[in-house]
Design a protein with these regions (language model features):
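Short, acidic/turn-prone active-site loops that include or flank metal/cofactor-
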Residues: 40-42, 97-99, 209-210
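A long amphipathic alpha-helix within ATP-dependent nucleotide-binding catalytic cores
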Residues: 175, 215-249
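Anionic group-transfer/hydrolysis microenvironments
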Residues: 41, 71, 148, 184-185, ...
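Redox-cofactor binding/interface segments in oxidoreductases and associated redox assembly factors
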Residues: 67-68
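Glycine-rich, highly charged phosphate/nucleotide-binding loops
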Residues: 41-62, 72-78
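Beta-strand scaffold of nucleotide-dependent catalytic cores
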Residues: 168-169, 192-209, 237, 241
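Active-site nucleotide/adenylate-binding loops and adjacent lid/helix of ATP-dependent enzymes
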Residues: 3-14, 19-26, 35, 46, ...
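Catalytic core of tubulin tyrosine ligase-like
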Residues: 157, 171-172, 186-188, 201-214, ...
Length: 249
């Protein structure tokens, strides 16, 4: 099974044509696996005394392991599916609880800070009157303002004055968003490093750089990427962060 002889593996993804999903399928096939791409929206869960079952598209879901490709759009229903799979003894690359914790920027920061992993100074703001106090707490202007759940650079803003910060927070609060005001790290302006952790080691890392005056380095915002070698210290921080958030990948 270790070499894919009898291992039945499924990739949980709503986008079988997405690049990341296709690459997982390609690499699995190279290892002699025959992966099945399963839409997480098409599971039905069954619970009875002493017994649980799960169907996908009307058929019994009979797999040994799953790789969830469920990101920022994860719902309580997706978490229920992953929990059901875990109870059936089906190994999951990431648990529903782990994905939920990592997708919420506030919750993730709380967990990392509690485990003495360095994070930018952060405040969670629910009232306009607290904006100035929050800015002072994180070290003064400029500040980064974020919604707690976002990806690909969406919902991340840099503000240079109290008035700008207050106006933005007011607008976001009116839309029902949860808002973080965060310390601006000058040395990381327009660039950051991403590490891919699998199990207990970093298997790949890259530096992302923004184009022009953009301070967000996301590839989806036309940023560029390049290979980077991480120091042992950075690798250990990345692995610890994944571990305390409950993520295998």
């Amino acid at each position: 099974a270790a070499h894919g002889v009898d291992l039945r593996i499924a990739i949980l993804s709503r986008g079988p044509r997405l690049y990341s999903t296709r690459r997982l399928v390609e690499e699995a096939k190279k290892r002699g696996l025959d992966p099945y791409v399963a839409d997480p929206m098409k599971f039905s869960l069954f619970v009875a005394d002493g017994r649980i079952d799960i169907l996908h598209n009307g058929e019994l879901f009979n797999y040994d392991a799953v790789i969830p490709r469920i990101g920022h759009s994860i719902t309580k229903r997706d978490v229920a599916v992953l929990s059901h799979l875990e109870q059936l003894g089906i190994w999951s690359a990431n648990t529903g609880a782990g994905i939920l914790k990592s997708r919420d920027k506030l919750h993730a920061s709380q967990i990392l800070a509690r485990n003495r992993i360095p994070v930018p100074r952060t405040t969670y703001v629910r009232a306009i009157i607290d904006v100035e106090t929050a800015v002072d707490f994180v070290g003064g202007l400029p500040v980064v303002i974020k919604v707690t759940q976002g990806t690909q650079g969406q919902g991340v803003f840099l503000r240079h004055t109290i008035r700008e910060a207050r106006n933005l927070v007011q607008g976001l609060l009116l839309t029902g968003r949860s808002i973080l005001i965060q310390e601006y790290i000058a040395e990381s302006h327009g660039k950051d490093v991403r590490a891919l952790v699998v199990g207990d080691r970093v298997v790949a890392s890259m530096r992302r750089r923004a184009r022009g005056r953009e301070f967000r380095s996301n590839y989806h915002l036309n940023g560029t990427v390049e290979n980077v070698d991480l120091s042992k210290e950075f690798e250990e921080v990345a692995c610890r962060a994944a571990r305390v958030l409950g993520l295998h990948i």
